[in-house]
Amino acid sequence: MSFDSLGLSPDILRAVAEQGYREPTPIQQQAIPAVLEGRDLMASAQTGTGKTAGFTLPLLQHLITRQPHAKGRRPVRALILTPTRELAAQIGENVRDYSKYLNIRSLVVFGGVSINPQMMKLRGGVDVLVATPGRLLDLEHQNAVKLDQVEILVLDEADRMLDMGFIHDIRRVLTKLPAKRQNLLFSATFSDDIKALAEKLLHNPLEIEVARRNTASDQVTQHVHFVDKKRKRELLSHMIGKGNWQQVLVFTRTKHGANHLAEQLNKDGIRSAAIHGNKSQGARTRALADFKSGDIRVLVATDIAARGLDIEELPHVVNYELPNVPEDYVHRIGRTGRAAATGEALSLVCVDEHKLLRDIEKLLKKEIPRIAIPGYEPDPSIKAEPIQNGRQQRGGGGRGQGGGRGQQQPRRGEGGAKSASAKPAEKPSRRLGDAKPAGEQQRRRRPRKPAAAQ
């Protein structure tokens, strides 16, 4: 199947071709025709499958096919909600790329930056608005944007929005929208909470599930190495050096842990940088660009800071510390093995993390293969201890960070960001992926009135 057969306009096809894409991915093959038919959609696809284009392309086709109901200033006709600033920036870049030859205006709004420039741009009229919920509600509260003409609503990474406690924000946004609209819900998994949200939001939706529920891509080779906690960094440096790994994304649980590990790896002679919410937008953007260009070999990240990162053909992901939430393991290793590429995911597991590993394997319904490098075997006399600061509080992309007015207070700055300038060379005939990488900016949270439960 080619993009030509999906009912997209020549101008959209031209833009897609200029990105070097020829063959739609499975999620695109199923989602694009359904959206063009006007169906509500409940789609589950892991990151890297091209899901962003799965809703962006038919959304643009819808807008150029139908004239807006309102006269005068362009109303917001398509609203895309995302949990983080970073993901919003990436989707916004996709929209701009694919609407290059269309008379379509788009805008990305999120917290962590001044609201005034966003208000000024909204005054000129916008067809497609990509937003984090908190900043969107700020703008609506200040009468900077009206949502009563929205024809298509997209909730992207809905599972993450629920995880981050943004359900009340979503409900408040829904009250601002017209009752008659098309709804598209995209999620990495079909959890029970997601299904409950879908029952209230969607009307007779088409369900698409490209990957099995809560499973890792078969293109990712997974391994576990048991090692004492105090020797993890030594083992990681050994494996990077011996294997001559040139591009490694490493996950830690905390921002402090990310900083400390990056410092230690640099002392080992391995060029590294940390990326998390306390880093300025400039620092995040530089680190990501340096990682993509090969100036640094290791990028150490927290879960939410790395959410939505798309680094082409990333060969190695390392869980320096296992996540407390098993589903986050799937999201982490989904950074590699994207589209048609293969990748390797390695987990360094100390005695404190054995239960976390069992939970992950229970979710995956299989045992992850073990490997052992001589000299790094764990000391059997060491007893397990409680994990300190184990469950990271979550943040996101609203006003200054999380976008959330919900019941959960995110940690400062674990949101997403603006788009990075660096972009790798495109290959001529690959499949259409999700998005391009982005950076992040942090600012102080402003006091705000509490939101009423919906």
UniProtKB/Swiss-Prot annotation:
In vitro, can replace RhlB in degradosome and facilitate the degradation of RNA by PNPase. The gene is rhlE. ATPase activity is stimulated by both long RNAs and short oligoribonucleotides. It is found in: Cytoplasm. A motif (Q motif) lies at residues 1-29. It comes from Escherichia coli (strain K12). It catalyses: ATP + H2O = ADP + phosphate + H(+). Interacts with PcnB. Interacts in vitro with RNase E. SMART domains: DEXDc, HELICc. Residues 219-381 form the Helicase C-terminal domain. The keyword Oxidoreductase does not apply. This is ATP-dependent RNA helicase RhlE. NCBIfam families: PRK10590.1 (NF007882).
